[in-house]
């Protein structure tokens, strides 16, 4: 492997490299969360349904799921600086034209463009730090990049709400542009080019099949409330998703550098950890999708107020994550993960029992408890998954963690939106009534009932995650 980063790099240059990567990580984290607060506003602006507007989130996740590992390997082959800088520029283009969108279709397409750039940034940023910084600084630097992502993830809802209330929803896209251009400039001017001379096979068929499997399944679920179980469109799309999945499993079993290393699932510790992560990520993403609609359209909070409310769990997670890691070292992952999942289930139960007169404290408490549960689950679960595989497979296991979390999140959003829409339609509301924020206020009990029922159903999946965590064991299974 030939690395220009093997030469001694001045400390000032190292700091600027780290700054560029931290900018990228912050933007990726911020962009994921800022749009959640805008969902009710976007639904009203475009006079569309929340089942349509959910695709602004789903398309972003689907593109990242399909491309992030591939972009990392392309960076190894063609140069990490090149792909990282290009990622910033593509992200700028997606942000600029996304803010100009006049239809939901345009917005969804430009979110996909953002995700294309985001996959290049996310896949190559930490590799650039690892290659270019000296070993004695590497751990701290990687910790800072992780902190940068979580800072963006934390401030995203509050910043997004403030921008929507003050200057309009389009600025949640425009705000990315100056920072992305700064990151691109630093990347191109400061970061040395690094690549490998080794031959690396890129699993393009696997990436494409993974995208098709998830995309077709989510599209089938999205169509279900409108066309029904027996409609040819639903049956055809679902069948194509299953066929794509079968081809994916076949391809991944044979390729030398698969996106999904299926042999790792022979470990009960690994497979139970992945299964519980998929379920918990799905329920949490689903609630993050539904909660802004509940708070804005039913309880009358402004976007900026909603942004500050849903930040609560992220603050708790940042505080609790180091504590959870220490507790995991002392008590083991099974106890911490099972307890964390159970706490999440309790928090979701109390969210489902909220009513139209719920006070701010009554809303915040379940979110705080939810953050505690997620923190107790997440770090120990990741540690146990990585500990269940041999050292040479740790990179593949880390990729599987990221892919699972995003796939679970996308599935959770799709299923919750479908169920919520189905319950409203079953209550006699037409599509135009469901789309209108005024209808939420004229028939609040109907929407409140659908919200509560959807959360209760999601909680069923959380309880299954509790069971997976409880049976995982503590040591890798041979």
What feature does the model see in each segment?
Residues 2-189, 320-324, 331-335, 339-345, ...:
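Transmembrane-helix bundle of Major Facilitator Superfamily
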Residues 177-195, 211-223, 240-254, 465-473:
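C-terminal membrane-cytosol helix-exit motif in multi-pass small-molecule transporters
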